Structures are given as C-alpha cells and as structure tokens.
Amino acid sequence: MDRKRYELNKELAQMLKGGVIMDVTTPEQAKIAEAAGACAVMALERIPADIRAVGGVSRMSDPKMIKGIMEAVSIPVMAKCRIGHFVEAQILEAVEIDYIDESEVLSPADDVYHIDKTRFKVPFVCGAKDLGEALRRINEGAAMIRTKGEPGTGDIVQAVRHMRMINRQISRLAGMREDELFQEAKELQVPYDLVLYVHEHKRLPVVNFAAGGVATPGDAALMMQLGAEGVFVGSGIFKSGDPEKRAQAIVKAVTNYQDPKVLAELSEDLGEAMVGINEQEIELLMAERGK
C-alpha cells in the first residue's frame, strides 16, 4: 500500500467520527443497528460476551455469514481477524469487507507479530491500551485505533483506563523538548516522525474510538467526554432487554454527550441492561493480548 492509499484509508476512518459501531451476528440485527443510526456494523458469529462464556479458540467468522450482513445493509461492514493471522485478513479483503479489525477478542494467531497492514488496501482497525501500542499499530498501517477495554463484560473501567492512559501519555509527549523525542521514540519502539506528529498536534495521527464494556448511553457519553471520537458497542445492545431502544439511545448519547438533560431522557425505560462481569472476576483479560 502506498502513502496515498494509506491517507485515503485514514480519511475513510475519519468519516466514521462521532458515530457508533455495533456488533451484529445476523442480517436482522444489522438492520436494527442501521435503523438506529449506527455508522457501521461489526459482523461476527458470536459477540464477545458469548466468546468469553464459551471459551476455547475463537477464529474469523464464516465469510458466507459476513456476506449476508453486507447484503442486508448500506452502511460500512467491519469484520474481525486474529492478531497476526494475515491469511484471515487476505480472505476478508477478498470478500470486499469495508474495514478489518485485527482483534484481541479472537484467539491470537501470532504472539510476537501483528499483521503488516501496509500490504493491504482495506483499512484496518486495531486496539490499544496505551500510546506505545497505538503508535506501533499505526506504524504497521492501522487507519483507526480503539481502546481495548475489556470486551464482553459490560464493565467500562478498562476502556476508561486505556483512554486516560493514552491521553495522559499524549500530554506528556506534547510537553517534551525536541531533543527528548528521539529517546521517547526508542522507548515506544516507533519511528521518530510518529512521535513528532503527536508532539506537534497533541493527538494521534488517526481517529481513536472507545471500545470494551460500553453498555449504556451514560457509558458512551463518558467515553466521548474523555476524548473518544466515536464508540464501539459489542455485547451491550443485543444482550440487553430492548436492543432497538438501547441502540437508538446510545447513538443519540454520542451526539449529545455534553448534555446531561438529554442523557437523562435517553437513559429512561431502556429495559434491562446486559448482566455484565466485574473486572475483578475475570480470569482471562483479552486486553493483554497483542502488545
């Protein structure tokens, strides 16, 4: 992928800014998400809560199922591949998916290397829990970053921790003298020009969404107020009592994230939220996969 293509991919990801991306497992769910105002959907066979409950090895979804969702909606469709599994990424590119998420939700295929995303034309989304991870993924060709959070839990604490960590490290880097940036680039294991960009612009070179544990309109607004440019919602919608109403409320919450009165109205009468798992009760932390 040449520089021009990468810039185009970054612009494609920019178009999702201020939006909500929802996990869906069927064409029917995809239609509900589109009608609710989702800017994109993530097609997968099992949502993170089910992956966590079932355990075992989780892999890329069946391409036939992904195609069914692509045919059902007009908004962009994303799909997940395993960390380091470049052949799964090749398959997803062949079915003409709009975005690929190299995701820690699935079982990693490579515990050393991530995919060289510069070899693909399709834009990639990657998770990060700190600035070093974010910049390393961008250096590999990611066009969009999201917090890792802790998928399938309905517990927002990890997403908050990761977003605050990235913001704190950006502020620290922005305040450095230029002669300190070379050492910082070495420590973060990324090229100097990426570190310089963050120093000068006080932000990542790509969009940064929040993901992992978003279950309510309040959760979505919290992540936006902390600096997220959009939100991924996985298990929180279709594991709740009234998915359609909750989906609409979360989309509106992202748009009106600074208005507590609107957020109060949106939070009323949504039915039961997903049950959720407390961070302290989890044996397997997916966020620790892929550094």
Swiss-Prot record:
Function description: Catalyzes the formation of pyridoxal 5'-phosphate from ribose 5-phosphate (RBP), glyceraldehyde 3-phosphate (G3P) and ammonia. The ammonia is provided by the PdxT subunit. Can also use ribulose 5-phosphate and dihydroxyacetone phosphate as substrates, resulting from enzyme-catalyzed isomerization of RBP and G3P, respectively.
Chemical reaction(s) catalysed: aldehydo-D-ribose 5-phosphate + D-glyceraldehyde 3-phosphate + L-glutamine = pyridoxal 5'-phosphate + L-glutamate + phosphate + 3 H2O + H(+)
Gene Ontology BP annotations: amino acid metabolic process; pyridoxal phosphate biosynthetic process; pyridoxine biosynthetic process
Chain residues that bind D-ribose 5-phosphate: 23, 152, 213, 234-235
Gene Ontology MF terms in the entry: pyridoxal 5'-phosphate synthase (glutamine hydrolysing) activity
Active site: 80
Superkingdom of origin organism: Bacteria
E.C. number(s) listed in UniProt: 4.3.3.6
Subunit structure as annotated in this protein's UniProt entry: In the presence of PdxT, forms a dodecamer of heterodimers.
Residues binding D-glyceraldehyde 3-phosphate, per UniProt: 164
Name listed for the protein in its UniProt record: Pyridoxal 5'-phosphate synthase subunit PdxS
Entry annotated with the keyword Membrane: no
Family matches, as SUPFAM superfamilies: Ribulose-phoshate binding barrel
Record keywords: Lyase, Pyridoxal phosphate, Schiff base
Family indicated by similarity: Belongs to the PdxS/SNZ family.
Pathway participation: Cofactor biosynthesis; pyridoxal 5'-phosphate biosynthesis
InterPro entries listed in its UniProt record: Aldolase_TIM, PdxS/SNZ, PdxS/SNZ_N, RibuloseP-bd_barrel
